[in-house]
Amino acid sequence: MSNSDSSSPLPESGRIAHRAKAADQTGWGRWLPGLRTLRGYQVAWLRHDIVAGLVLTTMLVPVGIAYAVASGVPGIYGLYATIVPLLAYALFGPSRILVLGPDSSLAAVILAVVLPLSGGDPLRAVALAGMMAVVSGTVCILAGLVRLGFVTELLSKPIRYGYMNGIALVVLISQLPKVFGFSIESEGPLRDVWAISTAVMDGESNWTTFMVGAGTLVVILLLKGNKRLPGILIAVAGATVAAGVLDLAARAEVSVLGSLPQGLPAFAIPWITTTDIVPVIIGGCAVALVSFADTSVLSRVYAARTRTYVDPNQEMVGLGVANLAAGFFQGFPISSSSSRTPVAEAAGARTQLTGVVGALAVALLLVVAPDLLQSLPTSALAAVVIASAIGLIEVTDLRRIYRIQRWEFWLSIVCTVGVAVLGAIPGIGLAIVIAVIEFLWDGWRPYSAVLGRAEGVKGYHDIKRYPDARLIPGLVLFRWDAPLFFANAELFHDRVLEAVATSPTPVRWLVVAAEPVTSVDVTSADMLAELDETLHASGIELCVAEMKDPVKDKLKRFGLFARLGETAFFPTMGAAVNSYLQTHPVDWVDWEDRVR
């Protein structure tokens, strides 16, 4: 048994944090989890949070700048998008140690909107990205308030892997020109690959720039698994010092970050033109989906580690407020970070004070020493983004999915190809469409079975799996393994009639084993009424067994309960069979009777 730090905010042994406890929170405590944490803050946590915040700062600065450039805005705005959102999330976010900020998973989505609309104007790019953050934040807050925190759970794991792998490829491709030291007109991922290859073959590469970028990438990847050595900090600092000492900007035309403006981000409304509204709204909604999908997964992982409960709806609100803060303080869309959060955890973070310390440290850098990173090569920043994109790519679990459920693997591949070929935003739209189709397909063609009595086995079982199971003369027991709704109502109707038609004896009763049926909608209720008419015309009585009370309540509202009659509903399959045998004399001896 492991020994946990006594100062760590964990519940007592034998207890599990759950939404039932979270529901007890009312008033300001519910909407401002940061205040709740502050009221219960322990002095013993302070040292851990301060140290973790300072360690985190070494990641926040280079990564924030790198992801800003990857998103199509000047690097300084990556630091702006780090400071205020961290402070906002500390107040509104429910997770104790989750770190928010610019992220590589959003870079491709932001760039897809900013690049074609900005026309190369950096201020216009900042306004577009800022308004995307406002849209994303508004969507997240509204979704959280109406309790739609479950919505990303509708995206299956293979589909999430698919579009994230696609986004990783798009991000990686977009950074290659910076590594090679030239620029191209982006026309989509596939065309960009061709343009990059052509430029390299034509000798447009700056090989000094390439060596700096490649060297930075190698150092980051080599130190990635080392918790004691901050790989990104070492690689970026090394590249910056080398570029400054050797004066690579002047001698080898290596592109560098340049001077950063001194001071803190100011409140500013990101004004855009009317022609930008539609693409910005679409892009903002795509950002909201991707960022919350990432944040909800990461939040649950760390909540499980700290044995705390995180309300997904409040998580959505916290993420939304952080994005609003980013949008109105010269930032751009942000998300949780799967690279910075582990750094905070490993450094001993206890609460969101870690993020507050990190934000204040970044702010101090901008006020006191903004020129510290002026010699940072842009190829090194590209290497940081590429390393993060490589980390987004999921291969191991896809291999497992390929072994156990091949068709879901191919859905994932389709999503990856869709993002890589169509671009980030259309690709995400494709992933959503595929998720809806997958959901409907599973419910549209569920498993169904005719049940029989197997020798020596209690209950009634699928005659396909128990070929020796006997059928009761005149009685069809039909099981439907799914909710009944508009997409599968007609299929249910057809399969029931097929079961009746293939019965070896004339059918008198048809009993639906309804325990797996968790819901019924209006379309399927109307279908059941039509089915009852069809069966009744043939002298067959429709009965239902083991139906759950909430589903039965729906049938009462739809008028089906009165139509079929209370006597048509049975609590168990055994009760239905016994009632049939009592009213219909048939040649039937149960194996349990023979045992007696």
Specify the residue positions occupied by each region the protein language model found.
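Transmembrane helical cores of multi-pass ion-transport proteins
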Residues: S2-K458, K464, I472, L497, ...
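Cytosolic C-terminal regulatory domains/tails of membrane transporters and channels
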Residues: M1-L32, W444-R596
